Regions:
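Glycine- and acidic-rich phosphate- and metal-coordinating loops
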Residues: 23-42, 70, 74
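FAD-binding core of FAD-dependent oxidoreductases
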Residues: 41-51, 87-100, 217-220
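DPxDG-like acidic metal-binding loop motif
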Residues: 43-66
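Generic hydrophobic, aliphatic-rich segments that mediate packing or membrane embedding
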Residues: 13-17, 46, 50, 54, ...
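C-terminal nucleotide
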Residues: 1-25, 58-65, 73-84, 91-214, ...
């Protein structure tokens, strides 16, 4: 943690705080920010969560009326100033809670399809920290340079969605694994770190793990791991994520 006290917004070292305060042009104030996850390099969209929470807090304190979608849009625009390779999915995924499919359409329209959480009656979902944090810019730049390799993922997303609509959980988890293999094939930067490759192989070979993938851009952060309920047996600490239609809750195991 780091404490800053400045007379001018431009002198603030915390880039996220500086960008948001500069946008609103607020008078002097005290800002205290805490997090239960790494604020950078976790692959959990923590930067977007920070920005959205900060914008929401400022709007409430200053009686600025903003819809959730307006907050997501502003968060995306401000985050672009920090990372030109950031995507829509982080702010729009964090800013609107729940288990959902998001469609980003031409013209800027964003559509949400909120999904049944029946999957989680049978399967547990865990986060497993790799011990590796990274700046996502380099990974995302490498992915951007190989966009033609990303396109097959779009079809896989639709197939996974169709599986959920048919309440075919096993098929959905099959496509989750398939999407991870497709993601790795886009660029070697996704699994460049040796620790990531070792853990990936260990999870793939573990009989209690039904599906897994690395969250976020790749090459660090957390693995998302699925197992039968109360049946995960891996040599790593994990956090079980309880999913409801309204959002998620984490429980350390």
């Amino acid at each position: 943690s780091k404490r800053e006290e400045t007379s001018y917004i431009a002198d603030i070292q915390n880039e996220l705080v500086r960008i948001v305060l500069n946008y609103f042009g607020l008078p002097p104030l005290t800002v205290s920010m805490t997090s239960d996850a790494y604020s950078q390099g976790s692959g959990l969209a923590s930067s977007s969560s920070y920005i959205i929470s900060f914008i929401k807090g400022i709007s409430i304190v200053n009686d600025i009326r903003m819809t959730d979608i307006e907050i997501c849009k502003l968060a995306y625009e401000l985050e672009l100033e920090m990372n030109p390779y950031c995507g829509y999915q982080d702010p729009y995924g964090c800013g609107i809670g729940g288990f959902k499919k998001i469609d980003f359409e031409k013209g800027g329209t964003v559509r949400y399809d909120f999904l049944s959480t029946n999957l989680f009656d049978t399967y547990d979902m865990h986060l497993v920290f790799t011990g590796v944090t990274r700046n996502s810019k380099n990974v995302l730049k490498s992915v951007t340079d190989n966009l033609h390799k990303i396109k097959p993922l779009l079809k896989t997303v639709d197939e996974a969605y169709d599986s959920l609509m048919k309440n075919d959980s096993e098929r959905f988890l099959f496509y989750l694994n398939k999407s991870w293999e497709q993601k790795k094939s886009t660029t070697s930067a996704v699994t460049e770190n040796e620790t990531i490759r070792i853990m990936d192989k260990a999870l793939e070979e573990n009989e209690s793990v039904i599906a897994h993938k690395l969250c976020g851009a790749g090459n660090g952060g957390f693995f998302l791991v699925f197992s039968k309920a109360n049946n995960l047996k891996i040599p790593y600490e994990s956090v079980r994520i309880e999913v409801s239609p309204n959002g998620v809750i984490g429980k350390c195991l």
